[in-house]
Structures are given as structure tokens and as C-alpha cells.
């Protein structure tokens, strides 16, 4: 199964509460923190909601 590396590149300060919760649900905390997540529809949907705050890389 494919995986994606998600990195928080923009701060969640002054963002809507739903965006803050989405970032936390992805497992991201501080700036430049990264997590490797499975590439499925639920993960892609969460990433889409905060795409302007994170960077995405495909991991093999």
C-alpha cells in the first residue's frame, strides 16, 4: 500500500478551529513536523482540507 509523508509548513495560529483539529488529527503538532500516513481516501480528504498548510511527498 502506498504511503504519503505529510509535513506542516505553515502555522495553525489564526486558522479556523476545524483546520486546527484536522492538522491535529493528521498527527502534526509543531512546524516542520512530519508523519507518514497510508494513502487512502480518508487521509487524502483531510490533507485536501489543509492543503495550504502542509506539503505532501509520496513514500515508497
Swiss-Prot record:
Top-level division of the source organism's lineage: Bacteria
Subunit description: Part of the 50S ribosomal subunit.
PANTHER family: LARGE RIBOSOMAL SUBUNIT PROTEIN UL30M, MITOCHONDRIAL RIBOSOMAL PROTEIN L30
Record-annotated disulphide pairs: none
Protein name per the record: Large ribosomal subunit protein uL30
GO biological processes: translation
Pfam family, one: Ribosomal_L30
Gene that this sequence comes from: rpmD
Natural source organism: Limosilactobacillus fermentum (strain NBRC 3956 / LMG 18251) (Lactobacillus fermentum)
Keyword tags: Ribonucleoprotein, Ribosomal protein
GO cellular component: cytosolic large ribosomal subunit
Molecular function GO labels: structural constituent of ribosome
Family that this chain belongs to: Belongs to the universal ribosomal protein uL30 family.
InterPro entries: Ribo_uL30_ferredoxin-like_sf, Ribosomal_uL30_bac-type, Ribosomal_uL30_ferredoxin-like
UniProt keyword annotation of DNA damage present: no
Amino acid at each position: 500500500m502506498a504511503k504519503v509523508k505529510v509535513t506542516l509548513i505553515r502555522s495553525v495560529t489564526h486558522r479556523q478551529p476545524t483546520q486546527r483539529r484536522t492538522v491535529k488529527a493528521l498527527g502534526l503538532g509543531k512546524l516542520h513536523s512530519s508523519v507518514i500516513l497510508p494513502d487512502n481516501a480518508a487521509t487524502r480528504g483531510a490533507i485536501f482540507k489543509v492543503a495550504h498548510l502542509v506539503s505532501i511527498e509520496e513514500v515508497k
